[in-house]
Amino acid sequence: MNRAIFTILLAFVATASQAQGNNYTIRGTVDDPDVKVVYLEQQAKGYETLDSAIVTNGEFTMKGKVDKPVPAVVINKYRNVLNLFILEPGDITLKYPFSAVGGTLNDSMTYLATEYPRSIDSTLDDEARSKRFEQYAETMYLRHKDDALGLRILDMCFASPTDKLRLYNMGGLMIKEYPSFVSSKEVWAKYEATSEGKKMLDIQSAFDGKRLSDYVGKGKYVLVDFWASWCPPCREEIPGVVAAHEKYKERGLQVLGLIVNDDKKDADKAIEQMGIPYPQIFGITFEQIASYGINGIPHIILFAPDGTILKRGLRGEGIEKALAKIFGE
């Protein structure tokens, strides 16, 4: 055979093989009968709609090509996320809600999210189990720190903004350019600057001039609850905070509420309804609490007598655990 023709044939076969290797087929289910059309969107750089499909009898199919695996979602017309997965070559089965099977990266993510947690020693407490999970997730992330699996792991598997920032800084280009991370890294950095062991940052009310430093750093342990009357999770935490106040107030604990983006009348009504006995600072804004890397409430911080941050992000039983270590049962 003519050598030139042979070379051309080899190139054609290689190209055809590569094209076939980039193909994907997505088969998915939707529980909501009102969803008639679904949309496939990639999330690697900005948000780009790649395809759409009609839902028939709760099922849909999409086919296409992808150059390299990317984070993706299936959404409805209202942009509600129906499934979150990795778009990669191969056959991918999506089951509502949030189940993806097929493809090396999707299967690895499914193992991490569902199978690995079941393998952790069930006799460990929740904190130890969470730590064990995050250790394994970090190991997997470091093997995939510049691909779609690493991106999903960083996005979903770490609670601490300090850990997120540390791992983000170790990531490759896909991680560094992911829009959600780009917008969040400043918040993570502020959280890191006010993490456990760091000194307090002062906050002043524009309403009456009261300051956080009027209470913190004055020789007492101070438990500070950032909350609002319109926030149901905040109200759920209040009984535990009140109980901590009653139990430890004679043993050196000061409890303080910082009321965020709230109407004064609504806040006063909530204070009366829930029988909150400790002082409050009203007129605090989300812009102010962002200096602590807080992007949602409730957020509860325990300060040492010298103003050092001892614990933050306390919730539920964690409040009593932290205080019992200091004051005893």
Q: How should these model regions be labeled?
A:
Residues 43, 80, 95-98, 127-197:
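N-terminal targeting signals for export/organelle localization
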Residues 1-28:
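Bacterial Sec-dependent N-terminal signal peptides
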Residues 226-243:
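Conserved redox-active cysteine motifs that mediate thiol-disulfide chemistry
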Residues 270-276, 283-328:
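Thiol/disulfide oxidoreductase modules built on the thioredoxin-like
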Residues 20-140:
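A non-transmembrane, solvent-exposed segment enriched in polar/low-complexity residues
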Residues 203-222:
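A short beta-strand-turn-helix
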Residues 251-266, 276-286:
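Thiol-based oxidoreductase modules, predominantly thioredoxin-like and allied folds used
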Residues 223-224, 255:
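Hydrophobic beta-strand anchors of alpha/beta hydrolase catalytic cores
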